[in-house]
């Protein structure tokens, strides 16, 4: 397994010290110094003034002035630094460091999907203080349904944390499909009845709060960048396989959405001319071969009619159980999906050359999709002359991880609003 650079990890941990990228991106160097100080302190959890000054290449006097202003405004606080073990016996005043004041503001992240909605609240330090998931009654919804569900979810999670809406600085919402982040519009979503919806404006008007919306795969990528394996990586790609296939890309420690903001739609890249029908209405998309509805469609050839449930999850579990029991037709369905996934991953490597690919999503419980021969096929399909094989890691999944990424997007926006 090591020769194929395949690792299984649970990458998002609430207890990780600090949050956010541990390296400064090119864009961050262009932001106001107070914001840069906040980013460095938040990333390290607790850090000495002198270390912040060195990382930002500013003078001690400038750092003292900046930290004093941020302390007076309630954004950071002084805290005792733990001495190195060799200095435990030293006398004198313990060294003083800086830490983020968690109560300076709260941010809410929400994932809306066709089966369930989830929410996470972060304090200003990026610590998770609450989470909640709710099942969805109807799969297809109107924009007003989405607004109503979002507001109800926010009210419910605030009750569980004893916070008021006035404590919240910003909200971010993720949905699958084509999302114009800059314009705040949902161009297409598989469970929304309308297209080209100004969802950000609808939510802001209803919530009376600053709102950001984004494609849910981007939010999963932000979760890795802020809380997971991406914190210490300059560039990487995240590929998710659930009800659809999504992708997020980080370059120079920043999430990239494409030149016009609608890129990284790996699931709708074409892998077969006039191929299988995708839920987007076109044929030959990668998603149409490896997403859950694609596997269910193929399952009709392997399962008896009585075994095919209206519940996608139950049908897939039955198909998987048969494959594990040695049924060759069931195994062939997963094997075929794995080959298409290998093709898609090879295209990611060829186009973007990421330092690593992080695979996530509920469908990864089916190891046939990422077993050794799948990763070997990915490397075989990649132009490898002089190229080190790209590592592939299998990461944790679950609705709360997506919502935590949304909360990171909201926290990033809240920081811009507060540190101006």
Q: Where does each model-flagged region fall?
A:
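Short glycine-aspartate micro-motif
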Residues: 97, 107-111, 119, 168-172, ...
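ATP-binding/phosphotransfer module of carbohydrate and carboxylate kinases, centering on a glycine-rich
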Residues: 1-94, 99-131, 139-166, 286-420
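Short secondary-structure boundary segments
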Residues: 175, 241-243, 292, 361-362
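General beta-strand structural signal in soluble alpha/beta enzymes
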Residues: 78-79, 211-215, 249
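Glycine-rich phosphate-binding loop of actin/hexokinase-like ATP-binding domains
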Residues: 232-290
């Amino acid at each position: 397994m090591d020769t194929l650079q395949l690792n299984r990890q649970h990458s998002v941990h609430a207890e990780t010290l600090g949050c956010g990228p541990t390296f400064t991106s090119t864009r961050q160097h262009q932001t106001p110094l107070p914001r840069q100080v906040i980013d460095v302190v938040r990333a390290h959890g607790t850090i000495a003034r002198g270390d912040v000054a060195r990382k930002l290449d500013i003078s001690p006097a400038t750092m003292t002035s900046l930290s004093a202003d941020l302390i007076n405004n309630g954004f950071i606080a002084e805290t005792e630094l733990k001495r190195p073990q060799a200095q435990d016996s030293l006398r004198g005043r313990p060294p003083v460091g800086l830490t983020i004041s968690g109560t300076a503001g709260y941010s809410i992240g929400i994932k809306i999907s066709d089966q369930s909605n989830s929410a996470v609240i972060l304090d200003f330090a990026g610590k998770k203080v609450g989470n909640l998931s709710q099942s969805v009654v109807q799969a297809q919804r109107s924009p007003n349904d989405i607004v109503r569900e979002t507001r109800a979810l926010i009210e419910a999670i605030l009750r569980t944390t004893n916070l008021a809406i006035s404590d919240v600085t910003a909200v971010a919402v993720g949905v699958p499909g084509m999302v114009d982040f800059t314009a705040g519009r949902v161009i297409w979503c598989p469970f929304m009845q309308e297209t080209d919806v100004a969802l950000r404006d609808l939510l802001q008007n209803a919530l009376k709060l600053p709102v950001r919306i984004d494609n849910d795969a981007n939010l999963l990528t932000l979760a890795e960048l802020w809380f997971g394996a991406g914190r210490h990586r300059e560039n990487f790609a995240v590929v998710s396989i659930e009800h659809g296939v999504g992708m997020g890309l980080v370059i120079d420690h920043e999430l990239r959405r494409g030149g016009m903001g609608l890129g990284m739609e790996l699931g709708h890249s074409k892998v077969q001319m006039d191929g299988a029908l995708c839920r987007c209405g076109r044929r030959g998309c990668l998603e149409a071969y490896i997403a859950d509805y694609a596997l269910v469609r193929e399952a009709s050839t392997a399962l008896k009619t009585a075994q095919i449930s209206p519940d996608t999850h139950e049908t897939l579990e039955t198909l998987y159980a048969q494959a594990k029991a040695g049924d060759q037709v069931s195994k062939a369905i997963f094997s075929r999906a794995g080959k298409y996934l290998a093709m898609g991953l090879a295209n990611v490597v060829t186009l973007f050359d990421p330092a690593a690919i992080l695979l996530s999503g509920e469908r990864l419980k089916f190891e046939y999709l990422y077993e050794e021969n799948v990763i070997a096929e990915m490397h075989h399909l990649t132009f490898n002359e002089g190229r080190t094989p790209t590592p592939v890691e299998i990461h944790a999944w679950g609705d709360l991880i997506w919502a935590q990424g949304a909360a990171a997007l909201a926290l990033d926006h809240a920081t811009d609003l507060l540190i101006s």
